[in-house]
Structure formats: C-alpha cells, structure tokens
C-alpha cells in the first residue's frame, strides 16, 4: 500500500520543496488541535530558547541561525497540499486555523554572532500558545544546527591564528545543510566556502579550483604520471591564470611542486596539499618553492582537519586551511542541544521541574559584565524589564528581533562576523583554550 495522494511528491518536483509548515514535528499540531478544542490556544505565552550546558569541555558557544529564522518566518505557512495531508489526522477547525496561519508575535534575543553560555536566554518568543508552539521545531532545527557549526568554526578560527580558513564540507552533509553550514562558518570568521549556493544566497565568497580527478584525467595509458600532472597543470593555468591553486599531492608532492612552478612560473598563486604529514610536507614544499623562485606562492593544506590539527600546524609554513567534515559535523558536537521551553502563561512564570532538566520560569533578558579592559566577567540573566543597577561596564544582550511578525533586526553577515570577532577578543585568558574546561564566564540568574 503506497502513501496517500497528498503525501506523494509530484513527478518531476524536487524533493526539497516541502511546504515550510511541514518542517515540524507532528506533536506540535496535535497539541494545537487540543488547545483549540479546549480554548487555551489563544492564551498569551512566552517560550524561551537556551542551552542547559555547552558541549562537553567547550568554553563558549556562538549564536547562529537568527537571520535564517527571520528569513523562514514569512514562509512558515500551510498551503493547500499541506492542509490536505493534515486533514487526515486533524479536525476541520484545526486545518482551517493552519490554512490561515501567520506568526504575528514578537521575538527578542541575542544578535547573530553573539557568544552564549549555559542558561543564556538566546531567544524569547511571545504570542498566543497556538502560534508560538508551531515554531518550536523550526526554531530548534535552525539554531541547533547553525549554532553548532558556528561554535566549532570559531574554535578553528582561533586555532588558525589569523590564517584564512575555507569551508569545504558540502560533500560531507545534506545538500541544504551544506548551504547553512557555509553561512554559519562565514559568520564565525571563515574567509570563504566552496559552496556556490551559499555565495548566491548569502554572499559568502566562493573559492575552488581543481580536484585530483582533473590531474588523473590527463593520464595517458601506460604513460608517466609526471606527464599527466604537467598537462593538467598547464591546462588549469591556461584556463584560470597563474594565480590559481594547483593540487600537488595526486602522485608525489615534490614532483608536483616542481610541475606546478614549471606550469605557472614564479607567479603561481598557491599549491594545495591534501594528504600525508601536512606539517612535514608544508616545510619541504616551502623550501622547494623558495628555491624555485616562487617565494610568494601560498601553501594551502586540507584533509580531515579540525581545530586541534589546525593548532598543531601553527608553527608550520601554512598560509591557509581547507576544512570539511569536522566543520559540517560540529567537530564532535553536531547539535548545540538548545531547548524551547514554555516559561510564561498569561504573564505568570511557569517552569519545568523534572530532575536534571529544571529551568527558571518567567521571561528573561540578559546583559554581560566586563572589566574596563573589555574582558568579560559574567553573564547576568534577569527578569524581563527589570535590569539590575550595575555600575561596572556592561552590555545589553537581549534585542528586539521581530515585532508583530515582522523582522526588525539587522541580520547582515558583516555585522554578525564583527560580533563574533569582538566576542572572541573579549574572552578571558583561558576562554580560547581548546583543552576541555569550564565555561569561560559564569552565568548568574536573578529569579523572577
């Protein structure tokens, strides 16, 4: 027995064109149906997004996904096809509600690119129970993914010590996740991505030249591999110019470097090494390039890099890094483990009291204290609208993002990149360490 008609994809239709409203969990809609039936659907509520803890050993996280959420909100609707599917398990009144659904509430939260810590009220969603509960899965799927990627990327940026990083993970994740990952990595400080969709959609600079296949394509049956490599390099330079990046480890790195300089001359832009003992090979390649007169040719390394291997290469003559699998999987922490919890009903605080999952009730805002030098010292979470009197330097973190369903915040990637960079500079001495440790600053919550 096949799927019901409403669930079948139309022939020829891309499989990524599901109505945005269906990018959710079924229980959001069954809760809505019950709330509409008993009259509680329109009660004013506040839901809060936060992480109870950072991934094991991490000292900070980076908020990402805000811009994508604000972009997704107007699209989060239920069209005729979606409603046909939902009518199989929802009553007519609920389907009618969904057919007309628009989020018309308010959202406050941390700006994209802001650092966060355990208990930080990253997002506060206000509106009727009906409209807020429908957003839960959308909010968490965006923030848990993008924040995990940005947090890992920021650690890699710190480990690189100012050397550029290129995101190259598209082939290691879902095609739509790849675009979001490229965006999140760029926010965290990566210089570019190999993903063209991220360039088109978000303006992320795209980099890329050739893979090993292009070199092997030029092999002649029974002929020397050196001749194949020379032919491939000549073809690439003729097409892209001497400033291109030539991949020199298809056969032998030493021979590859010699062939690269022979093809492009001393103006060769860069070589890339994708395998082997990268530090040793980079040193040998640098010496060889300098001997051949290619003193300005850069060395790019790639191949299963993460923040730890990047840090280990800081003393080597490496000019930039290409990072793939580790980046798009959050470098061991593929989710930020953020939650979306009801904290207020009719203006009255409510809270969950389950063991190990208790969370303070009430709508909250936050500010961050610092020393006169700019080094941050504490995250202070307080009841919304009741900030404490503080004489030390501090910065308000909770900002208006959406009003009456309409975005009101600056979601430019340039602003987010700047916020990440300044946030990393503000961490105390141990905050940038890669070794496992406690959060860089404590979070203190003033009860409602």
From Swiss-Prot:
Q: Which GO terms describe its biological process?
A: NAD biosynthetic process; NAD biosynthetic process via the salvage pathway
What organism does the UniProt record list as the source?
Mycobacterium tuberculosis (strain ATCC 25618 / H37Rv)
Q: In which pathway does it act?
A: Cofactor biosynthesis; NAD(+) biosynthesis; nicotinate D-ribonucleotide from nicotinate: step 1/1
Give the EC class as a word: ligase
**UniProt-annotated stretches for the region Disordered:** 1-21, 353-372
According to its UniProt record, which protein family does this protein belong to?
Answer: Belongs to the NAPRTase family.
Domain of life the protein comes from:
Bacteria
Gene, per the UniProt record: pncB1
Spell out the InterPro entries in the cross-references. Aldolase_TIM, N/Namide_PRibTrfase, NAPRTase_N, Nic_PRibTrfase-Fam, Nic_PRibTrfase_pncB, Nicotinate_pribotase-like_C
This molecule's function is given as:
Involved in the Preiss-Handler pathway, which is a recycling route that permits the salvage of free nicotinamide (NM) and nicotinic acid (Na) involved in the NAD biosynthesis. Catalyzes the synthesis of beta-nicotinate D-ribonucleotide from nicotinate and 5-phospho-D-ribose 1-phosphate at the expense of ATP. It is not able to use nicotinamide. PncB1 contributes to basal NAD level.
SUPFAM superfamilies referenced in this protein's UniProt entry, alphabetically: Nicotinate/Quinolinate PRTase C-terminal domain-like (SSF51690), Nicotinate/Quinolinate PRTase N-terminal domain-like (SSF54675)
What EC number(s) does this enzyme carry? 6.3.4.21
Gene Ontology molecular function, alphabetical? nicotinamide phosphoribosyltransferase activity; nicotinate phosphoribosyltransferase activity
Post-translational modification as stated in the protein's UniProt record: Transiently phosphorylated on a His residue during the reaction cycle. Phosphorylation strongly increases the affinity for substrates and increases the rate of nicotinate D-ribonucleotide production. Dephosphorylation regenerates the low-affinity form of the enzyme, leading to product release.
Q: Please write the reaction equations for the catalytic activity of this protein.
A: nicotinate + 5-phospho-alpha-D-ribose 1-diphosphate + ATP + H2O = nicotinate beta-D-ribonucleotide + ADP + phosphate + diphosphate
* A single Gene Ontology CC term: cytosol
* Name of the protein in its database record: Nicotinate phosphoribosyltransferase pncB1
Keywords (A to Z) from UniProt: Ligase, Phosphoprotein, Pyridine nucleotide biosynthesis, Transferase
What taxonomic ancestry is recorded? Bacteria, Bacillati, Actinomycetota, Actinomycetes, Mycobacteriales
Q: Could you say what a knockout of this gene produces? A: Cells lacking this gene show a reduced incorporation of nicotinamide. Double mutants lacking both pncB1 and pncB2 show an absence of incorporation of nicotinamide.
Q: Name one Pfam family in it.
A: NAPRTase_N
UniProt modified residues of type Phosphohistidine: 212
Which chain regions cross the lipid bilayer?
none
């Amino acid at each position: 027995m096949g799927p019901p008609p409403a669930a079948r994809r139309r022939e020829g239709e891309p499989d990524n064109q599901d109505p945005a409203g269906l990018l959710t969990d079924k229980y959001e809609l069954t809760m809505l149906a019950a709330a509409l039936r008993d009259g509680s659907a329109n009660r004013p509520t506040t839901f809060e997004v936060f992480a109870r803890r950072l991934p094991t050993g991490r000292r900070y996280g980076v908020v990402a996904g805000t811009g994508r959420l604000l972009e997704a909100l107007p699209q989060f609707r239920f069209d005729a096809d979606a409603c046909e599917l939902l009518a199989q398990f929802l009553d007519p009144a609920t389907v009618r509600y969904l057919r007309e659904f628009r989020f018309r509430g308010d959202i406050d939260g941390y700006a994209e690119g802001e650092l966060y810590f355990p208990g930080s009220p990253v997002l506060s969603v206000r509106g009727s129970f009906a409209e807020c509960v429908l957003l839960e899965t959308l909010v968490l799927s965006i923030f848990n993914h993008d924040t995990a990627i940005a947090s890992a990327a920021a650690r890699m940026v710190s480990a690189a010590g100012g050397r550029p990083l290129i995101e190259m993970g598209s082939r290691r994740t879902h095609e739509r996740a790849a675009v979001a990952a490229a965006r999140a990595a760029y926010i965290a400080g990566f210089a570019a991505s190999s993903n063209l969709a991220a360039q088109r959609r978000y303006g992320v600079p795209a980099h890329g030249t050739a893979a090993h296949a292009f070199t092997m394509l030029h092999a002649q049956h029974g002929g020397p591999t050196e001749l194949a490599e020379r032919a491939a390099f000549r073809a690439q330079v003729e097409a892209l110019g001497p400033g291109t990046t030539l991949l020199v480890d298809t056969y032998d790195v030493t021979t590859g470097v010699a062939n690269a300089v022979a093809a492009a001359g001393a103006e060769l832009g860069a070589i890339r090494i994708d395998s082997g003992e990268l530090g040793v090979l980079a040193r040998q390649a640098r010496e060889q390039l300098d001997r051949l007169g290619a003193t300005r040719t850069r060395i790019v390394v790639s191949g299963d890099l993460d923040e730890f291997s990047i840090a280990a290469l800081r003393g080597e003559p490496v000019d930039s890094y290409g990072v793939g699998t580790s980046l798009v999987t959050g470098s061991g922490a593929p989710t930020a483990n953020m939650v979306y919890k009801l904290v207020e009903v009719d203006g009255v605080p409510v809270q969950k009291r389950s063991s190990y999952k208790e969370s303070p009730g009430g709508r909250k805002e936050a500010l961050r204290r610092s020393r006169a030098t700019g080094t941050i010292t504490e995250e202070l979470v307080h009841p919304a609208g009741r900030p404490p009197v503080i004489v030390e330097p501090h910065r308000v973190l909770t900002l208006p993002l959406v009003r009456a369903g309409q975005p009101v915040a600056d979601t430019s990637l340039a602003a987010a990149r700047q916020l990440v960079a300044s946030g990393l500079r503000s961490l105390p001495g141990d905050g940038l360490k890669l070794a496992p440790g406690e959060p860089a600053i404590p979070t203190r919550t003033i009860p409602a």
